[in-house]
Design a protein with these regions (language model features):
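Intrinsically disordered, low-complexity acidic segments that are enriched in bulky aromatics
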Residues: 1-201, 229
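Short helix/strand-capping turn motifs
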Residues: 168, 178-265
Length: 265
């Protein structure tokens, strides 16, 4: 994975790291128009500062620095999406990248601190209403970004911290229907396959196949991406891989050789 660091007010990408990955923060957000998101090529060429999405990168860099973290990761610009092999590797690794992050910052582009007074009970109700209605809870990719990290913090567009996954646990449970133990990082394999699919059933993705691909980490599955295959075919492939994985896990030879695992799938 590549990471970002901020030096002299400029953002710089690391080499593609395989091992000895330093501590890092990671951003969770909803994408705006493609033309307004900062890309890998923008960072390589030193362009893109006039794009709306640049503000999210500035926020992530500043918050990481406050938390004592030198490095951070943002999906729009840390992956070279023109390279299909790299994109496939990244999507198959993304659950683990979020899981391994020291902190995950959720940037809520549709919640502004200017719309409420911190000490006003009425405004607090308005803030919670906006939180429950946030687009972030409707997107496919943000499901694993909620479940995988140990630390998930929510921020307004101005960078004001609203709370974290634990302090907002009840609201998140009510919004998403996800069981509280799953929000607390119980092993996802403890939850029925159909229950995990239900967590995503109302969520949307820009590319229809991504509805299946965004669930790979939720099920601990690795499979190639075939954009153009359609959602139904991608889901069938995913279900087939899940069934095969469950069969392997049930074989006596596999069970005898199993060791206790600390990974969350």
């Amino acid at each position: 994975m590549r990471l970002l660091e901020c030096s002299d007010g400029k953002f710089k990408l690391t080499d593609d790291l395989v091992r000895d990955i330093p501590r890092y923060a990671i951003l969770s957000h909803t994408w705006g128009p493609d033309t307004e998101e900062v890309t890998f090529r923008d960072l390589v060429d030193g362009t893109g500062e006039d794009k709306t999405g640049y503000e999210k990168i500035r926020f992530c860099a500043a918050q990481a620095r406050r938390d004592g973290l030198r490095y951070f990761w943002v999906d729009t610009c840390c992956i070279d999406k023109s390279n299909n092999n790299e994109l496939s590797r990244a999507i198959n690794s993304m659950f683990r990248w979020y899981q391994d992050a020291d902190r995950c910052y959720v940037y809520l582009s549709d919640i502004s601190a200017s719309s409420y007074e911190e000490d006003s009970q009425q405004s607090e109700l308005a803030w919670e209403s906006a939180f429950r209605a946030s687009k972030w809870f409707t997107r496919g990719w943000t499901l694993q970004e909620l479940l995988a990290p140990a630390s998930v913090e929510f921020f307004t567009t101005e960078g004001r911290r609203l709370g974290d996954k634990r302090s907002l646990e009840q609201q998140i449970h009510e919004i998403t229907g996800i069981a509280v133990p799953a929000l607390r990082r119980s092993a996802l394999a403890q939850f029925d396959v159909e229950e995990r699919f239900r967590w995503a059933e109302t969520r949307q993705t820009t590319h229809e196949e991504d509805w299946a691909y965004c669930l790979l980490g939720i099920f601990g599955i690795f499979m190639p991406l075939i954009y153009g295959e359609g959602k139904a075919h991608a889901v069938r492939r995913l279900r087939r891989e899940i069934t095969e994985a469950m069969k392997r896990d049930d074989t006596p030879s596999h069970q005898e050789g199993m060791l206790p695992t600390l990974f969350f799938f």
